[in-house]
From Swiss-Prot:
Predominant place of localization: membrane
Gene source species: Staphylococcus aureus (strain MRSA252)
HAMAP family per UniProt: AgrB
Localization terms from the record: Cell membrane
Described function: Essential for the production of a quorum sensing system signal molecule, the autoinducing peptide (AIP). This quorum sensing system is responsible for the regulation of the expression of virulence factor genes. Involved in the proteolytic processing of AgrD, the precursor of AIP.
Gene Ontology MF terms in the entry: peptidase activity
Xref: InterPro entries: AgrB
Top class in the EC scheme: hydrolase
One Pfam family here: AgrB
Keywords for this protein: Cell membrane, Hydrolase, Membrane, Protease, Quorum sensing, Transmembrane, Transmembrane helix, Virulence
Annotated gene: agrB
Name this protein carries in UniProt: Accessory gene regulator protein B
Transmembrane segments: 49-69, 82-102, 107-127, 143-163, 164-184
E.C. code: 3.4.-.-
Keyword Membrane: yes
Length: 187
């Protein structure tokens, strides 16, 4: 166990005693804190790299656009924490660098973003085996996924370049995670 795991265990044990949690609740709290710690670590690495590469704002815009839709649309996940790091760096560092330096055609990006909104309309929300969506929430999540992706697309019609392309990139990345090609691999 590393330092952070020890601190998480200590804090989870403290919360268990203080709030009279049973063992299952303790494990849920501990897992939640472990996931949070890993995600914060990934964000620090990703945004530090973005800052060093002078693309912080573009990474932030792409990531926020992605997350706003993903919160309701869900979608495929990396198979492990290691692959999550690799995918995060590829999607939110490498792709924004490519968009920035290769000046991707605006019409092409607009078309891909519009197509991606169509993917969100067709496939959101996309549950996974490990992260199922309760039936009572599917309709609401679908509605918000469509509304948010549509609003983001409309915003791109009014925002200046290059920011437009990074909002569009976030929409495109999230739409790709919704495609059914990822779900046969999970079963």
């Amino acid at each position: 166990m590393n330092y952070f795991d020890n601190k998480i265990d200590q804090f989870a044990t403290y919360l268990q005693k203080r709030n009279n949690l049973d063992h299952i609740q303790f494990l849920q709290v501990r897992l939640g804190m472990q996931v949070l710690a890993k995600n914060i670590g990934k964000l620090i690495v990703m945004y530090t790299l973005a800052y060093i590469l002078n693309i912080f704002i573009f990474t932030l815009i792409t990531n926020i656009s992605f997350y706003l839709i993903r919160r309701y649309a869900h979608g495929a996940h990396a198979p492990s924490s290691f692959w999550c790091y690799i995918e995060s760096i590829t999607l939110f560092i490498v792709l924004p660098l490519l968009v920035l330096h290769f000046h991707i055609n605006e019409t092409l990006m607009m078309f891909l973003a519009l197509l991606s909104v169509g993917v969100v309309i067709k496939y959101a929300p996309a549950a996974t085996k490990k992260k199922p969506i309760p039936a009572r929430l599917v309709k609401q999540k679908r509605y918000f996924s469509i509304i948010i992706s549509t609003i983001l697309f409309i915003i791109t019609l009014f925002v200046k370049e290059p920011y437009t392309q990074f909002i569009q990139l976030g929409i495109i990345i999230q739409a790709i995670t919704l495609l059914p090609i990822y779900y046969s691999k999970e079963d």
